[in-house]
Regions:
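A conserved mid-protein helix/loop that constitutes part of the nucleotide-sugar donor-binding site
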Residues: 21-29, 190, 195-209, 227-230, ...
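Short His-centered aromatic/hydrophobic patch
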Residues: 98-105, 122
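Short hydrophobic beta-strand element within catalytic cores of glycosyltransferases
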Residues: 286-289
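Acidic anion/phosphate-binding donor-loop and adjacent secondary structure
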Residues: 154-158, 168-186, 196
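Conserved acidic donor-binding segment of nucleotide-sugar-dependent glycosyltransferases
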Residues: 301-312, 320-326
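Aromatic "clamp/platform" in nucleotide-sugar-dependent glycosyltransferases that forms part
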Residues: 250, 269
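N-terminal strand-loop element at the rim of the active site
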Residues: 10-18, 22-74, 157, 225-228
């Protein structure tokens, strides 16, 4: 009988999309360095022609990439996933399949039938699972459930009655930018995929309500929701905000944008463990966030949080930061960076995943 190679299978919507994909790229890069045997199925939910994926596929030897052609709405995607597994059964034994996007739980029962363990990793606040009996039923087929935030862990444990393990996100060690001599806030960076759940419209309402703000708001992220993007554009045009708003799209290296920014804002309706906050902390930039689960664990000062429908509270957060004396501001920046360096290493994140995936 042929001896089959034992490998791990990771399902990804796209190689580059949002925070979840960023974390799994970190995992993939670490896996390659450690010579872990990993196959990555890129589903191409959004049909993105990704140069970063092509570069990674050419460079890596231990991690292998396979590209599908979408078709989630028609169900064709799930057939393509299972076809890949079946076509490789003679020479590959997928011991574990890692899923992070709830609709991909569709394949969990079939994977179990084929003898593959299934691990689900919750990347937001667990709301999608909580609102869908279908996802809850499929989740029962998973051998392990993971979450990247304490809130999501607690919510999924209450929902499923099962143990949920928390694996914190990882962040590369990066140089800290010096504190700007002029601490005025004129360039606000909003790093997130363009989508209704990221709530970028709130920043546009802030611009409309506070015309005295004479700076610029910069949105950096892939356009996931075209309808929402069009809604934003219409609002911008209607309120003559074009000179104060910039859309960068996907930025492969965000370091320069963080360096230019005076303030980072994350207005999401819900989060797990937000990469944006970790990045802002690591680079030494102030950050304010929506007052929702997930973000409260990282941004513990309530004066740096705002309601998801309240541009007035954004203004209050900005004033709070601007009114800090130099010592208090520097202490805030240093304490934030210390949190990332102590608790959010990529090595710890990747090894924690592998300990479960390799069982």
């Amino acid at each position: 009988m042929l001896k089959r190679e034992r490998r791990i299978l990771l399902l990804m919507r796209e190689y580059v999309l949002g925070g979840a994909e960023t974390q799994f790229r970190y995992f993939i890069e670490y896996a390659e360095a450690q010579k872990w045997k990993l196959d990555v199925l890129i589903e191409h939910d959004l049909n993105i022609d990704d140069a970063a994926l092509k570069k990674a596929a050419q460079k890596m030897k231990n991690v292998r990439f396979y590209e599908l052609d979408g078709g989630r709405d028609s169900g064709r995607l799930y057939g393509s996933i299972m076809l890949h597994v079946l076509q490789n059964m003679l020479h590959i034994k997928y011991r574990t399949c890692l899923i992070y996007y709830p609709p991909d739980l569709t394949v969990a029962p079939l994977m179990r039938i084929l003898g593959t363990h299934v691990v689900y990793s919750e990347r937001t606040n667990g709301a999608a699972i909580g609102e869908s009996r279908y996802f809850q039923k499929r989740l029962k087929s998973c051998n392990y459930i993971l979450a990247n935030s304490r809130y999501a862990k607690d919510e999924l444990e209450k929902l499923t009655g099962r143990r949920v393990r928390q694996i914190r996100n990882g962040k590369p060690v990066v140089p800290q930018f010096p504190v700007k001599k002029n601490r005025g806030i004129r360039r606000i960076l909003v790093p997130a995929r363009i989508s209704a759940d990221k709530n970028q419209m709130l920043l546009l309402h802030y611009l409309k309500k506070y015309p005295k703000f004479d700076g610029r708001i910069v949105f950096a992220g892939l356009e996931e929701d075209k309808t929402y993007r069009n809604k934003m554009k219409q609002f911008i045009n209607r309120n003559k905000l074009c000179d104060q708003v910039e859309f960068l799209g996907h930025v492969e290296n965000m370091e320069g944008e963080y360096e230019k920014a005076d303030l980072i804002v994350l207005p999401s309706l819900g989060e797990g463990m937000p990469n944006v906050v970790l990045e802002a902390y690591a680079y030494g930039r102030p950050v304010i966030v929506s007052d929702v689960s997930g973000e409260q664990d990282l941004v513990t000062n309530p004066r740096l949080r705002f309601g998801v429908k309240n541009p007035e509270e954004i203004d209050a957060c900005i004033k709070y930061i601007q009114e800090l004396d130099d010592d208090s501001y520097s202490r805030l920046i240093e304490e934030n960076r210390k949190v990332v360096l102590q608790d959010y290493s990529i090595e710890k994140m990747a090894k924690s995943f592998y300990a479960i995936l390799s069982q």
